[in-house]
């Protein structure tokens, strides 16, 4: 089946409504929305700007807000005014990686059912890149990048979009609960476990 090269008005409206439902934000710019789905391979063959800059922006927005949300959840000021982390740095890193990785982002795109709307060049179409995990993850990042630019970098919009699209609060709670439940307490690690649970 040959892919369409451009969205029609009905496609744009459908995607806007779906993205609003999943992120809490309605993208105003139809051009930016189309660009989020336009791969470089198409732009080389035809015309227009690709989604690469939106992908880059979305990657940075995701990274920042996921770290912020984990930090808000797992860190606090102590009596001395120091920032006290309830988790170690290596756990923080692995937690962030578990929450945001290519497989997770691709699975969200699959759940949304929108990879078929990617606008690709002939070589990408032939190789069915729209089915590749990395390409789907890039699409997710592009959508977040469009939300950032379209909202004029509104921090409330961005945090809400990241929380909602990743189901971050529920997933974070589940991961932390499962990790703490799987810890075994013995003489060697009892103090560490108690500190982390405090």
Locate predicted features:
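Double-stranded RNA-binding/processing signature
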Residues: 1-198
